[in-house]
Amino acid sequence: MDFQLQATDNNARAGLLNLAHSQVATPVFMPVGTQGCIKSLDATDMQGILGAKLILANTYHLYLRPGEKVVEELGGLHRFAQFHGSFLTDSGGFQAFSLSDNVKLQEDGIVFKSHIDGSKHLFTPAKVLDIQYSLNSDIMMVLDDLVGLPAPLKRLEESIKRSAKWANLSLEYHKQKNRPNNNLFAIIQGGTHLKMRSLSVGLTHEGFDGYAIGGLAVGESADEMLETIAHTAPLLPKDKPRYLMGVGTPENILDAIGLGVDMFDCVMPTRNARNATLFTHSGKISIKNAPYKLDDTPIEENCACYTCKRYSKAYLHHLFRAKELTYARLASLHNLHFYLELVKNARNAILEKRFLSFKKEFLKKYHSRSH
């Protein structure tokens, strides 16, 4: 993997991430395709309509169903899903904790029961890499010990030491495999405790292809999250991509870009779409509300997305009320277009040294109304 830093504007960064299946301009937002697809969308929607170059899939879910060996036998995740861009896969540790009963944390890994059939499984640092090799992920995340917030200091310290140990074991294992197209990212933990974040960075070896800031958006305040990012991002190697996991709102993303983060993922645009919330530059709207029943205008004037060029708010209101499956697709296409355009415009602003004014102007309009 090759990462080229093209421009900076204060702490904001614009770069190019060269992966085996695509070249990705950063900052980048990665749509979340947990099961190997973005809910309600297919590869043609993602590539031909949205132009997405990098999407996220979930190791835990694909391991349990259909099984990584099935995906491997069918040509890997790209051929299986017919997505010819790149895939980042997370390690599955978070899902093992959040979806399973009777999770047991051990020094060598995580023992969990499948949420599908109750069968028992062990995720170790090597095991989750083997799964991701079978999937043929472009970017693989290491297994980590995620802690919900707030958490006692002792538990945070235990988490970062275990996460760093697992990351370093993963790096050594990966070096033996000679798989240059499968890139490995470390994950920095430590909650909102700044000394713990510094310790986590210090314990994690150099030599990873990228570094993620994990363990945020799990119960802390927005101010705590931003303070943690502001502290952690400058500690990470300047020549490697920085990934903020699971974040977030348009405001969160712009704030984090301004603090030096390059990569983002979140279910928000698609989950909100399915629940009737649509993003516009003037704030969010709830398409299920009565005023849209006779509204013959698009979700947003001047929006170039597939949905806005073809359909009215009245039609989307009708589809949502009628519980039609097509609603989820049209709404998701709009919200993902909004997010992808947001980071694209942020990138252009960084290249032109006007990021702060771009952010200020965007947020002023975005907060002007929500209805």
From Swiss-Prot:
Molecular function, one GO term: metal ion binding
Organism: Helicobacter pylori (strain Shi470)
Pathway: tRNA modification; tRNA-queuosine biosynthesis
Keyword Transferase in record: yes
Region of interest: RNA binding: 246-252, 270-274
Biological processes, Gene Ontology terms: queuosine biosynthetic process; tRNA-guanine transglycosylation
Function: Catalyzes the base-exchange of a guanine (G) residue with the queuine precursor 7-aminomethyl-7-deazaguanine (PreQ1) at position 34 (anticodon wobble position) in tRNAs with GU(N) anticodons (tRNA-Asp, -Asn, -His and -Tyr). Catalysis occurs through a double-displacement mechanism. The nucleophile active site attacks the C1' of nucleotide 34 to detach the guanine base from the RNA, forming a covalent enzyme-RNA intermediate. The proton acceptor active site deprotonates the incoming PreQ1, allowing a nucleophilic attack on the C1' of the ribose to form the product.
Active-site residues (renumbered): D90 (proton acceptor), D265 (nucleophile)
Keyword field: Glycosyltransferase, Metal-binding, Queuosine biosynthesis, Transferase, tRNA processing, Zinc
Recorded catalytic activity of this chain's protein: 7-aminomethyl-7-carbaguanine + guanosine(34) in tRNA = 7-aminomethyl-7-carbaguanosine(34) in tRNA + guanine
Sequence positions that bind Zn(2+): C303, C305, C308, H334
Reported cofactor(s): Zn(2+)
Protein's name in the database: Queuine tRNA-ribosyltransferase
Cofactor note: Binds 1 zinc ion per subunit.
